[in-house]
Amino acid sequence: MYYFVTASKDASIYLQQPSQNTGRDEILEISKTYYGNLKDISHSLIKFNTNSISQSIASGEITASAAELILRECESSEIPTDYTIYAYAVSQSWDMGIGTRFDEISTDGVTWSSCKTGQNWMSQENHSSDTTGSFNGKGGIWFTGSFSSQSFSYEIDK
């Protein structure tokens, strides 16, 4: 039996555009890119409403013991032949916002600097020891005890 759940909200946030919101963009970006000595990182945030799933598991309607997150690659360039993607639970609530990647840089909603318009991500010091984040409290704070990862390895055709 398959049970499909779509995201209730999503957005990408960018180190080099710390006040940009992409809550209405159709593309989620995950990257670590270097432009000479300049590093740019993008994180994607995805929220699922799990209340109905929890109720269906409790009632026995859903008996599956595993779940999958399916993301598709789109217009990628210069992907390394070996890499791993990690998924962590974000420790704060956040607002999706209404921006897209190429809108004005400042749009309401989640950004690298803030989880909601006018509300910065909490610093690491304000969280328990089972969370981590960037050194300056920007880019999100996430739980470290529970995560999922997927590694990819490609052989280049000769």
Regions found by a protein language model. Give the residues of each.
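Secreted, disulfide-rich extracellular signaling modules
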Residues: 1-158
